């Protein structure tokens, strides 16, 4: 038996879940962020699960097995299990082909639940639309509420594609609409995302909870910049702008390279691996942000000696990357929040980010960094130069202060409140349905006696 280290702080009268089934079909929370499809969502799923467990809530995370070496059940921490569900081939299955394996995945989830006593889970929380499709069926089968977090929306991504990038297929938009309609509650990162759900998918605002993601404030902390640079083999005296994340057109690392080319004394550090359309160099799409194309672009811009590429980094090494940089750039075309921006600021590093999606929440414009409208390299170069010229101590303090307003504890406070509302509403609907059925049976009996 586990003891909660911190009581769940729910609004008075809301029920508290005992056990949560979390669905993350397309990417495991144990995967290294910055590789394949692993990114901020992986961090979110794992960190919220750990914090829920700290509150005494048991969490089982279901994800698709991607290797024959994956154990069926992986205990992560007391109260947190990851279940690797076999659904389709372990390797070589593109994310766009995963819908063909949702039936197999759903069957695996239902089989796992069948090993528990009836009524084991109190709630299902699905992440991304693929998981939402599974969650829709599982929640209905188990007669529990479905809470869904989209993380990204096809309509939003398609409205702001990088040049040459592939749009999301219509199948995804249809699937997202189905999940929005089926979910008892929808969790979004920002008010802006809530507005998008309402305008694009006609979501009921009363069913939406705004829950800011957090940051591990015990891990991501300020530190010695020179020591961090020495650990990474970087020059002690250079001005360094870092990019951290998956290398794909959506994240726009090529925009950073073109901007840095206009700043001759700036070094660029890129830490991450290919993902999505960043895995493929298509004919006629030479500008796409694939690793090979970025290397070629650096050569074309005459700045090969000013760009350092690192593979995806562990959390401890990632802290060193943030500390080593003078500025972290987040030039994404679309970003529902931007955990990288908050992690960097927690390490005392200011951020220059695109003014899209949730980044205006993650970065305090003019205080902890700066926001840039659009993706013109000249505009980015000018903003980077301004931030690099500002007082670093003032920016660093402001960055740390802003990041301190985001924590996984605060995230889970709000998440538990959303869970409580979902459970309460679901129970009320169920009781109402029972009452209506009982009333109909009574009326029928009276009619027979008459």
From Swiss-Prot:
Signal peptide: none annotated. It comes from Mycolicibacterium vanbaalenii (strain DSM 7251 / JCM 13017 / BCRC 16820 / KCTC 9966 / NRRL B-24157 / PYR-1). GO terms for molecular function: acetylglucosaminyltransferase activity; D-inositol-3-phosphate glycosyltransferase activity; magnesium ion binding. It catalyses: 1D-myo-inositol 3-phosphate + UDP-N-acetyl-alpha-D-glucosamine = 1D-myo-inositol 2-acetamido-2-deoxy-alpha-D-glucopyranoside 3-phosphate + UDP + H(+). UDP-N-acetyl-alpha-D-glucosamine binds at residues 32-33, 40, 246, 251, 313, 335, 343. PANTHER family: D-INOSITOL 3-PHOSPHATE GLYCOSYLTRANSFERASE, GLYCOSYLTRANSFERASE. Catalyzes the transfer of a N-acetyl-glucosamine moiety to 1D-myo-inositol 3-phosphate to produce 1D-myo-inositol 2-acetamido-2-deoxy-glucopyranoside 3-phosphate in the mycothiol biosynthesis pathway. Its EC number is 2.4.1.250. GO terms for biological process: mycothiol biosynthetic process. InterPro entries: Glyco_trans_1 (IPR001296), Glyco_trans_4-like_N (IPR028098), Mycothiol_biosynthesis_MshA (IPR017814). Belongs to the glycosyltransferase group 1 family. MshA subfamily. The keyword Magnesium applies. Keywords: Glycosyltransferase, Magnesium, Metal-binding, Transferase. Pfam families: Glyco_trans_4_4, Glycos_transf_1. This is D-inositol 3-phosphate glycosyltransferase.
């Amino acid at each position: 038996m586990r003891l909660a280290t911190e009581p769940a702080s729910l609004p008075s009268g809301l029920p508290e879940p005992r056990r949560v089934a979390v669905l993350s079909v397309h990417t495991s929370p144990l995967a290294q962020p910055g590789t394949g499809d692993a990114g901020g969502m992986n961090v979110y799923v794992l960190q919220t699960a750990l914090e829920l467990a700290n509150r005494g809530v048991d969490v089982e995370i279901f994800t698709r097995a991607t290797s024959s070496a994956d154990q069926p059940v992986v205990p992560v921490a007391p109260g947190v299990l990851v279940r690797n569900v076999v659904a389709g081939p372990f390797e070589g299955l593109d994310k766009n082909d995963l819908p063909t394996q949702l039936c197999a995945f759903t069957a695996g989830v239902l089989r796992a639940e069948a090993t528990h006593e009836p009524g084991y889970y109190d709630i299902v929380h699905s992440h991304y639309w693929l998981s939402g499709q599974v969650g829709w069926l599982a929640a209905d089968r188990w007669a529990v509420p479905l809470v869904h977090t989209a993380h990204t929306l096809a309509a939003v991504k398609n409205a702001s594609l990088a040049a040459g990038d592939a749009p999301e297929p219509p199948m995804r938009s249809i699937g997202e609409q189905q999940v929005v309609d089926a979910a008892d509650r929808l969790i979004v990162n920002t008010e802006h995302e809530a507005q998008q759900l309402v305008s694009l998918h006609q979501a009921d605002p009363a069913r939406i909870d705004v829950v800011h993601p957090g940051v591990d404030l015990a891990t991501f902390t300020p530190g010695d910049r020179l020591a961090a640079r020495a650990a990474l083999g970087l020059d002690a005296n250079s001005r360094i702008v870092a990019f951290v994340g998956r290398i794909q057109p959506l994240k726009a690392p090529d925009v950073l390279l073109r901007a840095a080319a206009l700043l001759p004394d700036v070094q660029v550090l890129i830490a991450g691996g290919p993902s999505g359309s960043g895995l493929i160099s298509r004919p006629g799409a030479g500008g796409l942000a694939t690793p090979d194309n970025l290397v070629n672009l650096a050569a074309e811009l005459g700045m090969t000696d000013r760009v350092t590429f690192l593979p995806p980094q562990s959390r401890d090494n990632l802290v060193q990357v943030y500390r080593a940089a003078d500025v972290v750039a987040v030039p994404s075309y679309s970003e529902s929040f931007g955990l990288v921006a908050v992690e960097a600021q927690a390490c005392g590093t200011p951020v220059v980010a695109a003014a899209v999606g949730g980044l205006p929440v993650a970065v305090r414009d003019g205080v902890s960094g700066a926001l840039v409208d659009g993706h013109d390299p000249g505009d980015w170069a000018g903003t980077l130069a301004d931030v690099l010229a500002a007082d670093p101590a003032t920016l660093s303090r402001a960055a740390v202060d802003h990041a301190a307003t985001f924590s996984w504890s605060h995230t889970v406070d709000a998440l538990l409140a959303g869970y409580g509302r979902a459970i309460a509403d679901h129970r009320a609907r169920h009781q109402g349905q029972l009452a209506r059925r009982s009333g109909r049976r009574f009326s029928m009996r009276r009619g027979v006696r008459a």
